[in-house]
Each structure stands twice: as structure tokens, then as C-alpha cells.
Regions:
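Enriched for short, Lys/Arg-rich terminal
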Residues: 57, 65-92
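A short, surface-exposed loop/turn module that caps and links secondary-structure elements
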Residues: 41-64
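Conserved phosphate-interacting/catalytic interface
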Residues: 37
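Glycine-rich, flexible loop/turn motifs
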Residues: 1, 18, 42, 49-52, ...
Length: 92
């Protein structure tokens, strides 16, 4: 279950289905990713073809990312079975 967000527009999209805080062309894929994150209790449950789940490295060790489009990723962490610190970013 998603417990916290870093990106206010992403949180608004998740809670109110208001896409003003994200790019319109990303809405469908981001919506799918958020639904999966809300149902997941471990990274293994998110290893879905086409979403390219991968752990981050270096200073971001412990964080995970899923591909939205181009360089855009939804990043997040697990805290036990909960998903926290959900963000939408271009970290490349």
C-alpha cells in the first residue's frame, strides 16, 4: 500500500484522479504503476514485463524505479510491506 509521496502532483493524481500535476501523456502509464504499487507488498510483485523495475544504486541504494517514458521514472522505497516516498522524476 502506498503510504507517502514526494511528488505533490503525483499524490493528487493518485488520490483525486487530477492530472494537472503530471504530464498528460504520462497519465495512463503512471496510473497503472500507481495501482500496482498500491497493491504490492514486495518488489517481486512488481516485476512486470514492460515496466522495467530496477533497483537504484550508489547514494540511492534501497530505492526502486519503474519506467514511465524516455528518462521519466516513478521511484519509490519499501518500508516493510508499504510503499513510501513515491516520486515522478527524470534522474538521468
Amino acid at each position: 500500500m502506498i503510504k507517502s509521496f514526494r511528488h505533490k502532483g503525483l499524490e493528487r493524481f493518485f488520490r483525486k484522479n487530477d492530472s494537472r500535476g503530471i504530464q498528460v501523456q504520462h497519465a495512463s502509464r503512471v496510473g497503472r504503476i500507481l495501482s500496482l504499487l498500491d497493491e504490492a507488498s514486495s518488489p517481486e510483485q512488481l516485476n512486470i514485463p514492460g515496466l522495467f523495475l530496477h533497483p537504484l544504486k550508489g547514494e540511492r541504494k534501497g530505492e526502486w524505479a519503474m519506467t514511465v517514458s524516455g528518462n521519466w521514472r516513478v521511484t519509490f522505497c519499501f518500508d516493510g510491506e508499504d510503499v513510501i516516498a513515491v516520486n515522478l522524476e527524470d534522474y538521468h
